[in-house]
């Protein structure tokens, strides 16, 4: 591989890293009250079982992230991600989805 190709791919890779680092992610947003209530219910339903609690919280987190892209994924998308469902707000449009 010649030097120009190496330089090109290095710059491309660095641009990708910077873009990913600076992009607004779902985890960067404050949690809405409806999502906090859903997390509390998940912990309550686990009845002290830490494994079940972890699975439920991970499930909610993944659904919140996926609902940002597709509001018809589950019926509770409007509760999990009110920034994007049913209407996309400016915050939702800035997310790196």
UniProtKB/Swiss-Prot annotation:
Subcellular location: Secreted
Protein keywords: Disulfide bond, Secreted, Signal, Toxin
UniProt signal peptide: 1-23
Post-translational modification: Contains 3 disulfide bonds.
Domain of life: Eukaryota
Main localization of the protein described in the UniProt heading: secreted
One GO MF term attached to the UniProt entry: toxin activity
GO CC aspect terms: extracellular region
Disulfide pairings: none
Expression sites (tissue/organ): Expressed by the venom gland.
Homology family: Belongs to the scoloptoxin-10 family.
Protein name per the record: U-scoloptoxin(10)-Ssd2a
